[in-house]
Design a protein with these regions (language model features):
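A short acidic, Gly/Pro-enriched loop at the edge of an enzyme's catalytic core
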Residues: 207-215
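Mid-domain Rossmann-like dinucleotide-binding core that forms the NAD(H)/NADP(H) cofactor-binding site
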Residues: 130-204
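NAD(P)H dinucleotide-binding glycine-rich loop of Rossmann-like/cofactor-binding domains
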Residues: 90-158
Length: 323
C-alpha cells in the first residue's frame, strides 16, 4: 500500500489541532478517478466544518476536508477521463461525505470532476487557476441568478471577501454600477481596483444610505433584513454567504420584508462542465485575473490558513499550491 500525507479531521477542533498524517493512498473504483492534488483553495465552509459542523450526522468522520481542488488524473478507472488530464473538482460531498483535497491525492467521483479548458492555461498562471473553482463558480452563479445587466446598480455586502472581490470583477465586466461595503475605509482602494464605483463603511446598519436594484448578500442573516430595506421596488437580493457567522434569522416577515421585492440564493453544489467552461471563457474574454490573498505551499500550513480565514483579513482567495 502506498502512503500519502493528508489532514484528517476526526472531530470538531481548533485550527492549531489540524495535523498532517500519513494514510493509505485511496484505491481506485468504478466511476471515480484518482487525482494528484496540485493545489486547492481554502473555504469558509471548511473552517465551519472544523469549528462546529464536524459532529453533524451527515459528515462521514474521520474525513479529509477540502471541497475543491486542481489536479492531474493519475488513474481514470472506467471514466471518460484520460491519465494526465488537468482537472478542477468541487463540491458534491467532497470533504464531507468522502475525503477531500487536503491531501497529496484524492479519489473523486467522476460527476464532480471537470477538465480545465486549454484556453485557461494561455491566460492564467497555475496559482490563478487554483483560485478559480469554488469561488468563481459561486460568484458566477450568484451574478447569473441576479440576472445582472449593465443598467443595474449592484450592492455587494461583504465585498472584501474572496467571493465579493470575484463578484465585483464579473459585474464590472458586465458594466453595471457597483457599490461595495467594508468595515474599514482602509480597504476602499482595493475595492476600487476590483471594480467598485462607490465604497461604504458597513457597521451592519446602512439605514437606507444607498438604494440599489440588485444586492449580493455575503454577510448573511446578520445583515439580511437591512439589505432588504435597501432594495428598490422589484429589486432582487441574492443571499450567498454567511460571513457574519449567523446562519439563521429571527424576525423575518416575508409579507413585510419582501413587499414588491425578490429574494433568492445560490447554492454551489451542482457544478457542470458547461458552466466551468463558461467561467474560464468569461475570465479569458474579459482579461480577469483571480484575486489571491495568500499562497501556501505545505499541508503543514493548514492551521495558519484557517486562522487567516477566521481573521477576515485575507482580502482575496487563500490557496495552497503543493506542486
Amino acid at each position: 500500500m502506498i502512503i500519502m500525507k493528508a489532514i484528517v479531521l476526526e472531530n470538531t477542533c481548533k485550527a492549531e489541532d489540524l495535523k498532517v498524517s500519513e494514510i493509505d493512498m485511496p484505491q481506485v473504483k468504478d466511476d471515480w478517478v484518482l487525482v494528484k492534488i496540485i493545489g486547492f483553495g481554502i473555504n469558509r465552509s471548511e473552517v465551519i466544518l472544523r469549528d462546529y459542523k464536524a459532529d453533524e450526522p451527515y459528515i462521514n468522520l474521520p474525513v479529509v476536508p477540502g471541497i475543491e481542488c486542481v489536479g492531474e488524473i493519475v488513474d481514470e478507472s472506467n471514466t471518460d477521463f484520460s491519465k494526465g488530464d488537468m482537472i478542477v473538482a468541487l463540491m458534491g460531498g467532497m470533504g464531507r461525505s468522502f475525503d477531500g483535497s487536503y491531501a497529496e491525492y484524492a479519489l473523486l467521483p467522476e460527476k464532480n470532476v471537470f477538465k480545465i479548458p486549454d484556453v485557461a492555461f494561455n491566460h492564467l498562471t497555475m496559482e490563478e487557476i487554483i483560485a478559480v473553482p469554488e469561488t468563481y463558480f459561486t460568484a458566477y452563479g450568484s451574478i447569473s441568478t441576479l440576472n445582472l445587466t449593465k443598467k443595474d446598480t449592484l450592492l455587494v455586502r461583504g465585498a472584501t471577501s474572496a467571493t465579493g472581490l470575484t463578484a465585483m470583477q464579473l459585474a464590472s465586466a458586465i458594466g453595471c454600477k457597483i457599490i461595495a461595503t467594508s468595515r474599514s475605509e482602509d480597504r476602499f482602494e482595493k475595492l476600487k481596483r476590483y471594480g467598485a464605483d462607490e465604497c461604504i463603511v458597513d457597521d451592519g446598519d446602512l439605514s437606507s444610505q444607498v438604494l440599489s436594484n440588485k444586492i449580493l448578500e455575503l454577510i448573511g442573516p446578520k445583515t439580511l433584513l437591512d439589505s432588504l430595506s435597501l432594495l428598490e421596488e422589484n429589486g432582487i437580493c441574492c443571499v450567498t454567504g454567511v460571513l457574519g457567522g449567523i446562519e439563521y434569522m429571527d424576525g423575518f416577515d416575508p409579507i413585510k420584508h419582501l413587499y414588491n421585492k425578490y429574494m433568492t440564493s445560490f447554492f454551489s453544489n451542482f457544478p457542470t462542465q458547461e458552466i466551468i467552461d463558461e467561467i474560464f471563457s468569461f475570465l479569458v474574454k474579459n482579461d480577469i485575473k483571480p484575486a489571491i490573498g495568500k499562497v501556501y505551499s505545505s499541508l503543514e500550513d493548514i492551521p495558519k490558513a484557517h486562522k487567516l480565514m477566521e481573521s477576515n483579513n485575507a482580502q482575496g482567495k487563500i490557496i495552497f499550491r503543493l506542486i
